[in-house]
Design a protein with these regions (language model features):
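N-terminal Rossmann-like NAD(P)+-binding domain of SDR-like oxidoreductases, especially those catalyzing
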Residues: 1-187, 229, 235, 239, ...
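C-terminal substrate-binding subdomain of Rossmann-fold SDR/epimerase-dehydratase oxidoreductases
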Residues: 18, 24, 31-39, 55, ...
Length: 290
């Protein structure tokens, strides 16, 4: 029989790539999406036109991890073999404006799913998406599975709670419940408010002449950037292990924001010249002096 997977957060970057990966693996995939007044499935719309994917193996359900009734009902109806919890309010800055909502979604959301698994079928495998923001004010570099957490935002704190409640339920109820602590992972499906997409979009506009400036913060800030397609494969592999464990998922390489800007400019054919230092450092397009 085909395996059945349930994805919370199916309309996000990771949910879209994971759906396509699992469908090509022969899974039956169910995704949970929130009701919205505007179209919010653009990342997964191409599933229906991909010749390598059987469209009748993909199903969408309305639900929300902030609502325990919908979480339980969907899991009870589908009876999945694997559940991937990718649903989250994932913006660090926004978590300071909406700390209660972030906690309700990112922390309690995981708890609601775990409680449903305990009540419905303890054999269901569970993957919880963690974040490098859980490390926060890092106590060692590089970080690994044994590095202590020191979150510096409501988002990071909520993810730490989800991490530990997953481990607690694994040990208390003998569940196959796992955590993946993901470092930054990008793709063309990444939200436009994230720095990589912000840079690409702004520089394309400058190249096309519809804009002249891009404002950034600390361009020497470094990030471990991977590709989302690779990271969803890691998620799947975690649930194929013989025993449930927790893993850090990263590229183990760091690049500065400035390096990323230079790389995008090179691909666009923009010869960038940097002048000044500190907060006054600016990059100019040599050809057009902008």
């Amino acid at each position: 029989m085909k395996k059945v997977a349930l994805i919370f957060g199916v309309t996000g970057q990771d949910g879209a790539y994971l759906s396509k990966f699992l469908l090509k693996k022969g899974y039956i995939v169910h995704g949970v999406k929130r009701r919205a007044s505007q179209h919010n499935t653009f990342r997964i719309d191409d599933i229906y036109s991909d010749p390598l994917i059987k469209k009748n193996n993909f199903f969408l359900h309305y639900g929300d991890v902030t609502d325990s009734i919908s979480v339980f009902s969907i899991i009870n109806k589908i009876k999945p073999d694997e559940i991937y919890n990718l649903a989250a309010q994932s913006h660090v800055a926004v978590s300071f404006d909406l700390p209660e909502y972030t906690s309700n979604t990112d922390a309690s959301g995981a708890l609601r799913i775990l409680e449903s698994i305990v009540k419905i079928n303890k054999k269901i495998k569970f993957y919880q998406a963690g974040s490098s923001e859980m490390f926060g004010k890092v106590v060692e570099t590089p970080q690994n599975e044994k590095t202590p957490f020191y979150p510096r935002s409501p988002y990071g704190v909520a993810k730490v709670y989800a991490y530990w409640i997953t481990i607690n339920y694994r040990e208390a109820y003998d569940l196959f419940a796992t955590n993946g602590i993901l470092f930054n992972h990008e793709s063309p499906l990444r939200g436009e408010t994230f720095v990589t997409r912000k840079i690409v979009i702004a520089l394309c506009k400058i190249f096309l002449g519809s804009s002249e400036k891009l404002y950034l913060g600390n361009i020497y800030s470094k990030r471990d950037w991977g590709h989302a397609e690779d990271y969803v494969i890691a998620m799947w592999k975690i649930l194929q292990k013989n025993k449930p464990q927790d893993y850090v998922i990263s590229s183990d390489k760091q690049y500065s924001v400035k390096y990323f800007v230079d790389l995008v400019c090179k691909l666009l054919g923009i010869k960038l010249v940097w002048k000044g230092s500190g907060i006054k450092e600016k990059g100019y397009w040599k050809k057009k002096n902008i």
